[in-house]
């Protein structure tokens, strides 16, 4: 975007806003940095290779260049915030019809991130930029499951439970707790549940 040398501060500000919006649409990494203050107003965004890697790979999944992805990072690396909260909010900008199914070893954790995702989408920052892409369907408006007007939805479940939902994107964020991870029985339970239940919920891609 080229502006005349005499461009006013208001014009420069508007041009910068357009550039930032376009950057956030094209790059999940840019979206994460720009959206960070909405969800973590008291914590400064700190760039890092792990953030870049997560964003790069999740964007590749969205674009169909990666089918299956495992993310292993240290606790406190913003994995849940980036993967379970920001990712579906960003993907709905370009593909609002996507249907998501999220799970965790505790239902409360999956519910927490579902609420955070909706908070981000309903924020003035998001609505001012992409509020015309879709609206929430008020007839399908629950914390555990909400749907938009493009027929996309975000639903949650927990490890070990069944679900009748089908999805385009299936995410299990922490299938076991840190304590359970050392237990062969708990790992086997999580693996059996994933292979026997969650993996069968994916729509044909």
List PLM regions with ranges.
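N-terminal accessory segments
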Residues: 1-67
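Contiguous, well-ordered alpha-helical segments that form the cores/surfaces of helical PPI scaffolds
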Residues: 55-59, 81-93, 173
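Walker A/P-loop
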Residues: 65-88
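Residue-level preference for the first positions of well-ordered beta-strands
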Residues: 68-70, 99-101, 153, 169
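Post-Walker A helix-loop "phosphate-sensing" segment adjacent to the P-loop in P-loop NTPases
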Residues: 90-99, 122-125
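Conserved nucleotide-state-sensing and coupling region of NTP-binding domains
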Residues: 103-160
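Conserved RecA-like ASCE ATPase "motif II neighborhood" in helicase/translocase motors
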Residues: 143-197
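ASCE RecA-like P-loop NTPase motor cores
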Residues: 200-203
């Amino acid at each position: 975007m080229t502006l005349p040398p005499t461009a006013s501060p208001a014009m420069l500000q508007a041009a910068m806003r357009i550039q930032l919006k376009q950057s956030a649409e094209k790059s999940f990494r840019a979206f994460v940095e720009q959206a960070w203050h909405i969800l973590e107003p008291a914590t400064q965004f700190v760039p890092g290779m792990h953030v870049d890697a997560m964003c790069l790979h999740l964007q590749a999944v969205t674009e169909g260049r990666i089918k299956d992805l495992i993310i292993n990072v240290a606790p406190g690396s913003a994995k849940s915030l980036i993967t379970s909260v920001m990712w579906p909010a960003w993907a709905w900008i370009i593909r609002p019809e996507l249907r998501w199914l999220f799970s965790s070893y505790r239902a409360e954790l999956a519910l927490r991130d579902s609420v955070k995702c909706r908070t981000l989408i309903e924020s003035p920052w998001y609505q001012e930029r992409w509020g015309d892409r879709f609206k929430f369907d008020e007839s399908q408006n629950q914390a555990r499951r909400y749907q938009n007007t493009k027929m996309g939805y975000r639903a949650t479940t927990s490890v070990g439970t069944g679900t009748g939902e089908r999805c385009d994107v299936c995410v299990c964020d922490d299938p076991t707790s840190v304590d359970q991870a050392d237990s062969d029985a708990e790992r086997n339970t999580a693996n059996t549940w994933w292979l026997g239940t969650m993996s069968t919920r994916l729509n044909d891609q």
